[in-house]
Amino acid sequence: MPTLYTHSDSNKRKTWLLLSVFFMSIILIGYVFSYAMESSAILYFAVIFSVVSSFISYWWSDKIVLKMSNAKLIKFEENKELYRIVENLCITAGLPTPRIYIIQDSAPNAFATGRDPEHAVVAVTSGLLEKLDRSELEGVIAHELSHIGNRDILLATLVTVLVGVVVLLADFFRRWTFFGSHRRRSDSKGGGQLQLIMLILAIVLSILAPIFAYLMQFAISRKREFAADADGALLTRYPEGLAMALEKISADPEPLEAANRATAHLYISSPFKKHTPYPSQEGNKKKGFFARAMMTHPPMEERVAALRGMDVKK
């Protein structure tokens, strides 16, 4: 029989691996640019920037995400029913009760963030509270608590911040390269062949790095959603509640105003809507590999089908 939070240790390792890969990638890009530009200052800047970014991401990434989402902390008196649902599920799951935030937005959605279960946050939109019944809301909260129990909230939040850093640095280095190469052409008639190769490599890296960063972000997001769906259903012992909630959230035509591309993968369902219910399975099959790779969430009908195929009676 499946048990809760079997992905916890794996996600701890993935978090440290992510930080290590990020750190080494920035140093590699910085080294290539330093060689191409004949300036060691670029490498020093890359090292310092990656260390500071990793530190900030670990300790304050949740606050950054909450600020970006316009989420506001609420007290027990402001929504007693929501607090009781969260507290009851936390007791069942053996988790500390997270802080609860509300996003004033009519689009139904939710996410969890924080560096560990002791510093976790669950954020839900006002639209979610208005449009779901109790069993559906319990399913959504159980899904978010499963992200907390599996300790993948830090992984997901770090990805949000670090992908933004990679994109920012890549753009900065690319602009620096064009400026520096133009200035060197003015000072000399030519450079070494190796330096020219490194310059081309630097430009290619600055273009490809953000693409690979986004692909990694989306891949992590899709995998963690399936795991949280399964664990959420185990927690409530009622997969149909979460399945119905996902159908309602997906079919709702309103986009989430506070969402952006950096935080989209954190939500239980993509916050960007096209004013249509979730696409058919046939429609998803017609999508190309790259289109599917760029999806922040698994196809909704696959998630719903997986939930309705679960047996949690034992």
Give the ranges of each region predicted by the language model:
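Membrane-embedded alpha-helical segments in integral membrane proteins
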Residues: 25-34
